[in-house]
Swiss-Prot record:
Entry-linked HAMAP family: DNA_HJ_migration_RuvA
One Pfam family matching this protein: RuvA_C
Subcellular location per the Swiss-Prot or TrEMBL entry: Cytoplasm
Residue numbers spanned by region Domain III: 155-203
One GO term describing the cellular component: Holliday junction resolvase complex
Segments for region (Flexible linker): 143-154
Domain I: annotated segments: 1-64
Record-given protein name: Holliday junction branch migration complex subunit RuvA
UniProt key word DNA-binding: yes
């Protein structure tokens, strides 16, 4: 079981990051809310991971702290919620925002996430509220919204295409992803900024 990785970021292709540890490159899937906090390629990062084995693949999911990983593991225990949907949920909302939505029973907020219908939202609220009660201490502490800079890099068209691809990977349909990005696109924004703003605008 791989529970934690510390290494150098080789590539960032939302929502994937390639992290080199002891000469081995690990491809890690991360929620966009965690991806935003990663340093730039070439710098060191620490991610807490959850290893998922499927018939057709072995996948690593990464998080910036143990609390986010705990929430992911609780999410995939919910009936009808697999790793891909859990990743989409935590990309559309931070861990704290999701906890707040569940505790306040905000069905309307949850159904705006890709792949979440009313029944799934109601199931999440019922099951996750019970699990939150069983967890000791404060599961999460509120974090201030991150202000992203836009370092020099790909062109605006490249950034938009990368943002659309990331949204599709998170469960949005291609046409919907294109529409979301085009509504908030601007020349000075990198792909991470576009993804963040598109997800925020969808909620």
């Amino acid at each position: 079981m791989i529970g934690r990785l510390r290494g150098i970021i080789l590539e960032k292709q939302p929502p994937l990051v390639l992290l080199e540890t002891a000469g081995v490159g690990y491809e890690v899937h991360m929620p966009m809310t965690c991806f935003y906090e990663l340093p730039e390629a070439g710098q060191e990062a620490i991610v807490f991971t959850h290893f998922v084995v499927r018939e057709d693949a072995q996948l690593l999911y990464g998080f910036n702290n143990k609390q986010e990983r705990t929430l992911f593991k609780e999410l995939i225990k919910t009936n009808g919620v697999g790793p891909k949907l859990a990743l989409a949920i935590l990309s559309g909302m931070s861990a704290q925002q999701f906890v707040n939505a569940v505790e306040r029973e905000e069905v309307a907020s949850l159904v705006k996430l890709p792949g979440i219908g009313k029944k799934t939202a109601e199931r999440l609220i019922v099951e996750m509220k019970d699990r939150f009660k069983g967890l000791h201490g404060d599961l999460f502490t509120p974090a201030a919204d991150l202000v992203l800079t836009s370092p020099a890099g790909p062109t605006a068209d490249d950034a938009e295409q990368e943002a659309v691809a990331a949204l599709v990977a998170l469960g949005y349909k291609p046409q919907e992803a294109s529409r979301m990005v085009s509504k908030i696109a601007r020349p000075d924004a990198n792909s991470e900024t576009l993804i963040r703003e598109a997800l925020r605008a969808a909620l």
